[in-house]
């Protein structure tokens, strides 16, 4: 790789890379922090910028720390372990506010302190790569800037009982041969954990589940693709709030950080208060991470989700927990919303949006200028959030408050939540 002379880093980008300039050209430098002087090696060159990796740190930032993970230099799983955890939070908040202002022309009236939880051993879900070469089976994560697999026997951001499975997997996969596994999912509920093996066809017998449980512990399930081979599927659940149980499968989307998710739910409940007998519309509701707690707290909730299987299972959970009278589940495509559909939701004065990374563009574009009165928006992408906030401001909404949610400690991903209230 081509080496370049020293530059001073003046910012951080949304991928956690240091930003510098050389001869007027922007350079994104993996592994560099703001205010550091570094030399770098070019990894790729575009017309308007250079991508690079740190070669030598000449003047380190006082915020730099030694990464805890022995695989950090090679593994692509974490991006920010070399940055003090408190500074990570402040840096994410700064980047989030910059995105809101630059892309959305918006600034929250009240910027709350970041919502944070455990920094280590917090992830209850992980996707593992597998590579077979001769007699060696590598199980781990994709390498930085590569599709190579970095074999790991621990992961410091995984919950302990999930991480404990890592050193057991290569030998277990070797025993499965000639069946080969393309990918592995590790998922933790409150009672059991699940090992999911992605194979090209259903090739495994339930006996392998018992063998895995004998190896890893009785609290494990074994799944092959979407089929539970060992254990009771209904045992895989979490409680978003006390009194509410949400059952899920390994393929379902759930927030990876249990403690931060619980804190986020409490924030959403507080911002949508008063809830007793109020009407709330929950868009992009998934299995009911927010809508089940909202109904439990007394709100009348209409929850809308695009995946029919999730809607059906959410409705089943509502019925099992005697919440059906306060929770209606609807299935529709929220990336194409009609005026007639909007009108059918007008009785709900409070709306909750929790879209995927693409944001809620179709919803906010179709929003009339009469309702709702307030919107709580949970975002996993500052760029699409800023775009949607700009549209909402043009329709009479005020960005009252917001905060970064540190759902993904040591990664560059930014989760956030905002409250917008109608002013006209």
From Swiss-Prot:
Signal peptide: none annotated. Residues 1-56 form the TRAM domain. SUPFAM superfamilies: Nucleic acid-binding proteins, S-adenosyl-L-methionine-dependent methyltransferases. One of its GO terms (molecular function) is RNA binding. S-adenosyl-L-methionine binds at residues 255, 284, 289, 305, 333, 354. Keywords: 4Fe-4S, Iron, Iron-sulfur, Metal-binding, Methyltransferase, rRNA processing, S-adenosyl-L-methionine, Transferase. PROSITE patterns: SAM_MT_RNA_M5U, TRAM, TRMA_1. It is an enzyme of class 2 (transferase). GO terms for biological process: rRNA base methylation. InterPro entries: 23S_rRNA_MeTrfase_RlmD (IPR001566), MeTrfase_TrmA_AS (IPR030390), NA-bd_OB-fold (IPR012340), SAM-dependent_MTases_sf (IPR029063), TRAM_dom (IPR002792), U5_MeTrfase_fam (IPR010280). It comes from the Bacteria. [4Fe-4S] cluster binds at residues 69, 75, 78, 155. The active site is at 380 (nucleophile). It catalyses: uridine(1939) in 23S rRNA + S-adenosyl-L-methionine = 5-methyluridine(1939) in 23S rRNA + S-adenosyl-L-homocysteine + H(+). Its EC number is 2.1.1.190. The keyword Transferase applies. Catalyzes the formation of 5-methyl-uridine at position 1939 (m5U1939) in 23S rRNA. Belongs to the class I-like SAM-binding methyltransferase superfamily. RNA M5U methyltransferase family. RlmD subfamily. This is 23S rRNA (uracil(1939)-C(5))-methyltransferase RlmD. The lineage of its organism: Bacteria, Pseudomonadati, Pseudomonadota, Gammaproteobacteria, Cardiobacteriales.
């Amino acid at each position: 790789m081509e080496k370049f002379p020293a530059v001073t880093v003046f910012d951080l980008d949304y991928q956690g890379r240091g930003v510098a300039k050389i001869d007027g050209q922007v350079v994104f430098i993996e592994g560099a922090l703001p205010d550091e002087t570094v030399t770098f090696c070019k990894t790729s060159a575009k017309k308007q910028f250079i991508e690079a990796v740190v070669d030598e740190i000449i003047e380190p930032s006082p915020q730099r720390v030694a990464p805890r993970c022995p695989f950090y230099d090679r593994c692509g799983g974490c991006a920010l372990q070399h940055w003090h955890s408190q500074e990570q939070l402040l840096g994410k908040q700064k980047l989030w506010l910059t995105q809101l202002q630059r892309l959305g022309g918006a600034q929250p009236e009240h910027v709350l302190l970041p919502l944070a939880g455990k920094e280590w051993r917090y992830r209850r879900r992980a996707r593992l790569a597998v590579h077979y070469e001769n007699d060696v089976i590598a199980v781990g994560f994709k390498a930085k800037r590569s599709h190579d697999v970095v074999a790991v026997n621990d992961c410091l951001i995984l919950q302990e009982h999930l991480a404990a499975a890592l050193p057991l997997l290569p030998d277990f996969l070797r025993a499965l041969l000639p069946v080969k596994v393309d990918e592995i999912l590790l998922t933790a509920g409150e009672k059991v954990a699940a090992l999911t093996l992605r194979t090209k066809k259903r090739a495994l017998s339930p006996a392998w589940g018992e063998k895995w449980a004998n190896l890893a512990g009785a609290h494990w399930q074994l799944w092959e693709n979407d089929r539970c081979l060992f254990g009771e599927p209904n045992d895989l659940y979490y409680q978003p709030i006390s009194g509410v149980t949400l059952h899920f499968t390994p393929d379902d989307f759930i927030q990876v950080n249990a403690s931060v998710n619980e804190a986020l739910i409490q924030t959403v409940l507080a911002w949508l208060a008063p809830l007793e007998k109020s009407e709330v519309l929950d868009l992009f509701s998934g299995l009911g991470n927010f809508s089940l707690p909202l109904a439990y707290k007394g709100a009348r909730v209409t929850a809308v989700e695009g995946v029919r299987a999730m809607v059906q299972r959410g409705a089943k959970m509502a019925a099992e927990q005697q919440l059906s009278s306060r929770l209606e589940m609807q299935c529709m495509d929220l990336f194409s919303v009609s005026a007639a559909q909007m009108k059918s939701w007008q009785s709900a004065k409070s709306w909750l949006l929790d879209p995927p990374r693409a944001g809620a563009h179709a919803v906010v574009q179709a929003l009339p200028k009469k309702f709702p009165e307030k919107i709580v928006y949970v975002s996993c992408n500052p760029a699409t959030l800023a775009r949607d906030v700009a549209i909402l401001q043009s329709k009479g909404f005020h960005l009252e408050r917001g905060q970064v949610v540190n759902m993904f400690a040591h990664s560059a991903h930014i989760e956030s939540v905002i409250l917008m209230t109608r002013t006209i």
